[in-house]
Swiss-Prot record:
<dbReference type="InterPro" id="IPR011342">
    <property type="entry name" value="Shikimate_DH"/>
</dbReference>
<dbReference type="Pfam" id="PF18317">
    <property type="entry name" value="SDH_C"/>
</dbReference>
<keyword id="KW-0028">Amino-acid biosynthesis</keyword>
<feature type="binding site">
    <location>
        <position position="93"/>
    </location>
    <ligand>
        <name>shikimate</name>
    </ligand>
</feature>
<protein>
    <recommendedName>
        <fullName>Shikimate dehydrogenase (NADP(+))</fullName>
        <ecNumber>1.1.1.25</ecNumber>
    </recommendedName>
</protein>
<feature type="binding site">
    <location>
        <position position="84"/>
    </location>
    <ligand>
        <name>NADP(+)</name>
    </ligand>
</feature>
<dbReference type="InterPro" id="IPR041121">
    <property type="entry name" value="SDH_C"/>
</dbReference>
<dbReference type="GO" id="GO:0004764">
    <property type="term" value="F:shikimate 3-dehydrogenase (NADP+) activity"/>
</dbReference>
<comment type="pathway">
    <text>Metabolic intermediate biosynthesis; chorismate biosynthesis; chorismate from D-erythrose 4-phosphate and phosphoenolpyruvate: step 4/7.</text>
</comment>
<comment type="similarity">
    <text>Belongs to the shikimate dehydrogenase family.</text>
</comment>
<dbReference type="InterPro" id="IPR046346">
    <property type="entry name" value="Aminoacid_DH-like_N_sf"/>
</dbReference>
<feature type="binding site">
    <location>
        <begin position="133"/>
        <end position="137"/>
    </location>
    <ligand>
        <name>NADP(+)</name>
    </ligand>
</feature>
<dbReference type="InterPro" id="IPR022893">
    <property type="entry name" value="Shikimate_DH_fam"/>
</dbReference>
<dbReference type="GO" id="GO:0009423">
    <property type="term" value="P:chorismate biosynthetic process"/>
</dbReference>
<feature type="binding site">
    <location>
        <position position="228"/>
    </location>
    <ligand>
        <name>NADP(+)</name>
    </ligand>
</feature>
<dbReference type="GO" id="GO:0009073">
    <property type="term" value="P:aromatic amino acid family biosynthetic process"/>
</dbReference>
<dbReference type="InterPro" id="IPR036291">
    <property type="entry name" value="NAD(P)-bd_dom_sf"/>
</dbReference>
Amino acid sequence: MKTKTNQSVKTFGIVGFPLSHSLSPLIHNSIYKDRNINASYLVFETQNLNVEKIQEFRNSGILGLSVTIPHKETAFTLADKADDTSRIMKASNTLLIGPDSTYAYNTDGEGAYHSILEFSPESLKTGKVVILGSGGSARGIAFSLAVSGKIQNLLVCSRNEITAKEICLLVTKNSNVKAEPISQDVLLTRKEEISLVIHTTPLGMKGQSPGPYLPEDFFNSNMTLFDIVYNPLETPLVKAAQKAGAKIIPGSEMLLYQAMKQFELFTEISPNAEDIIKTRERLSKALENR
């Protein structure tokens, strides 16, 4: 990143590691082309994100970044200003890079919430919601659900007990939701309370340990599983839930809706219904070929 990008073209991108399977460039570049927007979206694969790296992006004319694993919590700390979700939950998946300041946003929660409302709104009413994992995605999702007014109870199950407790404390402090950290062993004994399972860890992702996070007999036909892993769509966890008759929300839906919000933040143009339909079709086709 030694030279500035073409300044007549607005340049955005994604930062994370690894990124070889990311579909974000397909999403953003396709909409730019559809809308005749003079912009490009690049891939910046890096294991380190710090102040110096942000300055490199700024010097190169990069105006905005999608942030993914493992940098979401780091991204928040590098921003000068942040939206409520980022500020409260201490994780961001979007950075806008201005001449002098960096702004952090979190569109993960909004993306997940839209997906749930579209595919399984009843799952927010009939029982408790459990989030599996306590990383950057889990933080954004937990906050958006907590402030939605749609749930009263939230469980967070993570192998990292410290971050699970932190998420629950932040949710309880900043909403009317009762949030409770829970171990996997205890969760297995309380499965009848659960209506919605949201899986946010890398387990099942291509190139990662397959999992599943929960055994097959955890699920039943009254549950909904939302595994935010989208490559592959049918993870071992999804297959286990399907076998038990649970409803499935595709992980690609969160990718779709969080990207639509990022597109709006990057371009100041609101996505329309046609953008969503076309993007969903492109994602489906791309995932079929993987």
